[in-house]
Swiss-Prot record:
A motif (ITIM motif) lies at residues 5-10. One of its GO terms (molecular function) is carbohydrate binding. The gene is Klrb1b. Residues 1-45 are cytoplasmic. Receptor for CLEC2D/OCIL. Ligand-binding contributes to inhibition of cytotoxic natural killer (NK) cells. May mediate MHC class I-independent 'missing-self' recognition of allografts, tumor cells and virus-infected cells. Its main location: membrane. PROSITE patterns: C_TYPE_LECTIN_2. One of its GO terms (biological process) is natural killer cell activation. This is Killer cell lectin-like receptor subfamily B member 1B allele C.
Amino acid sequence: MDTAVVYADLHLARTGEPKRESPPSLSPDTCQCPRWHRLALKLGCACFILLVLSVIGLGVLVLTLLQKPLLQNSPADVQENRTKSTDSPAKLKCPKDWLSHRDKCFHVSQTSNSWKESLADCDGKGATLLLIQDQEELRFVRNLTKGKDRSFWIGLSYTLPDRNWKWINGSTLNSDVLSITGDTEKGSCASVSQDKVLSESCDSDNIWICQKELKRESTCNDS
């Protein structure tokens, strides 16, 4: 009798104990993220890779376009450019015994003569008597004759009947550039000393200065 009671009590205690269930096992291939998250991630990676490749391709294209004009220059073109750059200074060179200043070549005579003879000498050299453009050029030519203590002829004479000082190229003297000192009459020509511009007889003897234009298309030739 006592043994049966004990058995019943033990049986009830075991049946009253709650049953523990083990958690369901997860498959290794099962992901806790929704499927559209994975799809968005893959698309984002693909777009990033395409963007990087596009930037690289664009950079290569720009470099190619920049280098193309340089590669198109043939050896003949390069040689021609070198020849032009080498020849340009030679075309601007004045003849021997001539001095260059700005866009002109200047030659100071070593002898004295009348204005007409001086004009003819310059003409024989393919030049003209000096035509003074401005005060700066006047200072330059005075420095050329410094120490000679003599006046020099320029291409300026007094003409009739208009009673004007005119340059040999036909232009009228600008008094802002030169101011003539001395008596002005028929047969007067202009000479320049270290401190003034003189009116004197064209038959007087003076040294003279010839000039040639410096032009890129032609070289001053020795006379």
